[in-house]
A protein has these predicted regions:
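Beta-strand-rich recognition/accessory modules
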Residues: 1-46
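Aromatic-lined carbohydrate-binding/catalytic grooves of carbohydrate-active enzymes
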Residues: 49-183
C-alpha cells in the first residue's frame, strides 16, 4: 500500500504506542523481552479478550495450495488438540497455473482445489469440532485477477491507479466495492 503523513512546521502528529527492543543474544532472548514488555497490555485488555480462541491456520502446511483433500488430512492429524478454529488460508481462490499472490481480488472458489465447493470442506472442519474460517486479503487485487483491469473501483492517487508491485487496492469508499466484497 501507500501511506504518508505530511507534518507542517508547528503541527504535530501522535502515533500509537509501539514496543521496540534490541538485545545481545538470540531470537529467544529478544522474544522474551518483547513478550514481557507487551504482557502489561495483554493482561490489562478488555474482558472480551481474556479467553481468546486457539486458531489453526493451515498456511504453513499447504503453502498457498489448500484443497479439500489436504485439509481433510490435516484435520485428521490435529483433531482433539484443542483448536477452536481452522482457517483456510490463501490459495482457495486461485485459478489453475496462476500463483495465489497475484490471484486475489476476484475471490471465486477454485473448482480444481475444491471440486464440491467449500461447503464440503466446511462440513469436514465442523465434524472435527472446529469452527471454519477463511483468509481474505480483502483490500488487495492481484495482477492476474479480472478486477485488476477494471480500474473504476480501485484506489487512485494523484489521478493514477495506486499500484504496488503486482497489486492494486480496492477503493473501500465505493459502494460497489462494499457490495462486491460483502457478497464474496
Amino acid at each position: 500500500g501507500d501511506w504518508k503523513k505530511t507534518v507542517k512546521p508547528g503541527e504535530h502528529f501522535e502515533t500509537p504506542t509501539a514496543i521496540l527492543s534490541v538485545c545481545e543474544g538470540g531470537i529467544d532472548d529478544i522474544c522474551h523481552r518483547l513478550v514481557c514488555a507487551g504482557s502489561k497490555y495483554v493482561d490489562n485488555g478488555p474482558e472480551s479478550e481474556q479467553e481468546l480462541p486457539i486458531i489453526f491456520n493451515e498456511y504453513c502446511t499447504t503453502w498457498g495450495n489448500p484443497s479439500h483433500e489436504n485439509i481433510c488430512k490435516i484435520l485428521e492429524n490435529i483433531k482433539g488438540r484443542g483448536f477452536d478454529y481452522f482457517v483456510i488460508d490463501c490459495g482457495w481462490f486461485k485459478e489453475d497455473g496462476i500463483p495465489w499472490d497475484i490471484s486475489m481480488g476476484d475471490y471465486n472458489v477454485s473448482s480444481t482445489l475444491f471440486p464440491q465447493g467449500l461447503e464440503k470442506t466446511v462440513e469436514a472442519i465442523r465434524e472435527k469440532g472446529m469452527k471454519p474460517g477463511i483468509w481474505f486479503e480483502i483490500e488487495t487485487v492481484g495482477s492476474a485477477a479480472r478486477a485488476y483491469q477494471d480500474t473504476s473501483h480501485l484506489l487512485h492517487k494523484d489521478g493514477a491507479v495506486l499500484t504496488s508491485y503486482f497489486r492494486r487496492f480496492w477503493d473501500m469508499r465505493d459502494p460497489y466495492v462494499e457490495d462486491y466484497l460483502t457478497k464474496k
